[in-house]
Amino acid sequence: MDFNGREKNEGINFFQKYLTIWVFICMVVGVIIGKLLPAIPNALGNLEISGISIPIAILIWIMIYPMMLKVDFQSIKQVGRNPKGLFITWITNWLIKPFTMYGIASLFLFTVFKGCIAPELATQYLAGAVLLGAAPCTAMVFVWSTLTKGNPAYTVVQVATNDLIILIPFVPIVKFLLGVSNVSVPYGTLFFSVILFVVIPLVGGVLTRIVVVKNKGIGYFENTFVHKFDNATTVGLLLTLVLIFASQTEVILSNPLHIVLIAVPLTVQTVLIFFIAYAASKIFGMSHNIAAPAGMIGASNFFELAVAVVIALFGTTSQAALATTVGVLTEVPVMLVLVKVANSTKGWFKS
């Protein structure tokens, strides 16, 4: 049931289940375009305002706006009902996750794989990893929560609060970690990208919800209106990835092994963060239907935002952009494994 007690039977859909395959297809299509028709990504790359690619901005709004529609910020009123689970989520997402991502990615990219990745490339890949680690997941959390039989009302609160919290610490955390990595980031561009790709879609989603619910009712909004946008996020993401891979053709063809190497620290990070939040929930006596979503929301990433910001900061041709797309490539299969782990350990938690 949802936060109002209505039953929902939403699981992972066709696009979500095979997202890794779609990303591979996007990679192939993008590389073919970049190799045979390089004028296309070059022309699209020139359509920009203040360093922001107009085609990419449109695609990212198509990705993020439907996600914001699904979040009911009225649920924040329920924060005080069971705050321990929320504190676990917040601490994991904002005080642990960004810094473990930085540490793990640095270890692998600069030490373990130093014989395979040049330092200047490793720095760019690290920047992409940092952007992935600094933003907890939004839309896909509802899928993971459903697959682990999580408490839907509590999951909504977890997502809603994180979507609001992201407005404050995301910019300084990214600025700090990229600064430590010796990556120069214009503070204004970083702040503007959050306004453009988080605040505007968030406000648009909230206003749309208010208007539609007022005129058509909550039932129509949740059962009909929202589902009109079901595939918009996926289509927007896949088209964005095609453009990125088209711009990354030479890097991919000259360093195909790098995609595998980048995937290693991202996978380690995902598993580690899941178990940190999951174990903390166990220690503090949370029920499984709160513990599982708590682990999932930290383990998965708001990769749509990461892709948006990395393009705004470094462009589609940067190696940092390639690192964020590898995050998209690896997330679904890893998260499906963690879903199985969560479901098989349900007996560890109180009912």
Predicted features along the sequence, with ranges:
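Alpha-helical transmembrane segments of multi-pass small-molecule/ion transporters
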Residues: M1-L69, Q74-A299, F303-S351
